[in-house]
């Protein structure tokens, strides 16, 4: 029986798997799988564990490879960043090197600037204005050039300018001579400060001229000769720009002369106001501009024509005190926008400042000028206003 089983076992051995690998035996009967339990089953579990370990090892190896690939991929970008940083460092080093190269020139510029400052201070005290202005202009140009820290070619130009400047300063008078000149100027300034102002002298001279003209019309010959002699003396004294004591004497003589003259006649007719050789009449009634021109002509006068800033201030004060709108002899009737006085003279550009704000505006054919508040205004010529007449002063005797 054993002999019969042995060939069967060998035949089955051809169909049996290794129990260490699968733990399953195949039988030709019914061609089905049959699992053998017991210790054969334990051996199959151990086979599965080895597979799991192999799978885990493979996954770990794959993770390591992925990590290596990631690190390797970062290397080019890191190298590129490192290269750009090196370029930036190199550029900064180049700029620093250039800046260091300019430091020596900067110290030289500071030296030049100090010399220029000293020269400017010295020249600023000198009295020769034309020469000083030329030097000061050169100093200003040099200072501006030095302040800009110029390049080397500019430095050479500055050195040349500085050399010429030093030569120019060397031609100026020495300090002791300057002090002498300055003292002389100080004395002259003090002396001039004691003299009467030019406007005051002109006023005195004008009054003297007017008095002389008025005296010429007086009938008493002996009295006229006496007054004329005093006028001649006063005129000569004023022409010599006398010192303060002489001025007081002139003022006293002038006062006495005016007092004596006023005993003989008045400057202006009754109800007229005298100012700087002229007589002014401020009306108490109102007329339009054309009738105001006629009213002044009837008394041998003229609707006021303003010649000086002093006269304007005087008249503006008179009208503002009385709070009256008063006609003056100014209009643009001949040509719109071209203002003329009644004597035919044009309005001076310097008088444009006397118009009130926004005037003249020609609102409703306003062609005639009036005193209004603190300035001038244009108004319609047919409006009734007060008016001001003007004529030269003369001798008017009391009746």
From Swiss-Prot:
The keyword Lipoprotein does not apply. InterPro entries: C-type_lectin-like, C-type_lectin-like/link_sf, C-type_lectin/snaclec_domain, C-type_lectin_CS, CD209-like_CTLD, CTDL_fold. One of its GO terms (biological process) is immune response. Residues 108-269 are annotated as: 7 X approximate tandem repeats. Pfam families: Lectin_C (PF00059). Keywords: Adaptive immunity, Calcium, Cell membrane, Disulfide bond, Endocytosis, Glycoprotein, Host cell receptor for virus entry, Host-virus interaction, Immunity, Innate immunity, Lectin, Mannose-binding, Membrane, Metal-binding, Receptor, Repeat, Secreted, Signal-anchor, Transmembrane, Transmembrane helix. Coiled coil: none annotated. Glycans are attached at residues 92, 361. A motif (Endocytosis signal) lies at residues 14-15. The keyword Metal-binding applies. Residues 71-399 are extracellular. Sequence repeats lie at residues 108-130, 131-153, 154-176, 177-199, 200-222, 223-245, 246-268. Predominantly highly expressed in liver sinusoidal endothelial cells and in lymph node. Found in placental endothelium but not in macrophages. Expressed in type II alveolar cells and lung endothelial cells. GO terms for molecular function: calcium-dependent protein binding; carbohydrate binding; D-mannose binding; ICAM-3 receptor activity; metal ion binding; pattern recognition receptor activity; peptide antigen binding; signaling receptor activity. GO terms for cellular component: cytoplasm; external side of plasma membrane; extracellular region; host cell; membrane; plasma membrane. Residues 1-49 are cytoplasmic. The chain crosses the membrane at residues 50-70. Ca(2+) binds at residues 359, 361, 363, 366, 377-378. Residues 274-390 form the C-type lectin domain. Disulfide bonds join 265-395, 268-279, 296-389, 368-381. The tandem repeat domain, also called neck domain, mediates oligomerization. In vitro, is a receptor for HIV-1 and transmits HIV-1 to permissive T-cells. Homotetramer. (Microbial infection) Interacts with ebola virus glycoprotein. This is C-type lectin domain family 4 member M. It comes from Homo sapiens (Human).
């Amino acid at each position: 029986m054993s002999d019969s089983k042995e060939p069967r076992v060998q035949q089955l051995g051809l169909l049996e798997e290794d129990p260490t690998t699968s733990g399953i035996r195949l039988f030709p009967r019914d061609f089905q799988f049959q699992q053998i339990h017991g210790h054969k089953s334990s051996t199959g579990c151990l086979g599965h564990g080895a597979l799991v370990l192999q799978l885990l090892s493979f996954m770990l190896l794959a993770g390591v490879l992925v990590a290596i690939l990631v690190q390797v991929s970062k290397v080019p970008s890191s190298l590129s960043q490192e290269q750009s940083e090196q370029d930036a460092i190199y550029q900064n080093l180049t700029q620093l090197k250039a800046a260091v190269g300019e430091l020596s020139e900067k110290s030289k510029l500071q030296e030049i600037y100090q010399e220029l400052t000293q020269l400017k201070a010295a020249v600023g005290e000198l009295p020769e204005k034309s020469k000083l202005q030329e030097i000061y202009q050169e100093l200003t140009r040099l200072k501006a050039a030095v302040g800009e820290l110029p390049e080397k070619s500019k430095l050479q130009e500055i050195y040349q300018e500085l050399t010429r400047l030093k030569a120019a300063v060397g031609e100026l008078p020495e300090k002791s001579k300057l002090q002498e000149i300055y003292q002389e100027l100080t004395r002259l300034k003090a002396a001039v400060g004691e003299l009467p102002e030019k406007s005051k002298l002109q006023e005195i001279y004008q009054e003297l001229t007017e008095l002389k003209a008025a005296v010429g019309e007086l009938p008493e010959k002996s009295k006229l000769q006496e007054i004329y002699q005093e006028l001649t003396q006063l005129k000569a004294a004023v022409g010599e720009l006398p010192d303060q004591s002489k001025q007081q004497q002139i003022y006293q003589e002038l006062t006495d002369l005016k007092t004596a003259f006023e005993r003989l006649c008045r400057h202006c007719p009754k109800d007229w106001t005298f100012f700087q050789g002229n007589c002014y009449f401020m009306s108490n009634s109102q007329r339009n501009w054309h009738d105001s021109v006629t009213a002044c002509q009837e008394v041998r006068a003229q609707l006021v024509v303003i010649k000086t800033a002093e006269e304007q201030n005087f008249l503006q004060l008179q009208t503002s005190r009385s709070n009256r709108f008063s006609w003056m002899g100014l209009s643009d009737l001949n040509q719109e926008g071209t203002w003329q006085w009644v004597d035919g003279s044009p309005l001076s550009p310097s008088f444009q400042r006397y118009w009130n704000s926004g005037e003249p505006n020609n609102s409703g054919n306003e062609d005639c000028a009036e005193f209004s508040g603190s300035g001038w205004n244009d108004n319609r010529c047919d409006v009734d206003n007060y008016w001001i007449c003007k004529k030269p002063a003369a001798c008017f005797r009391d009746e």
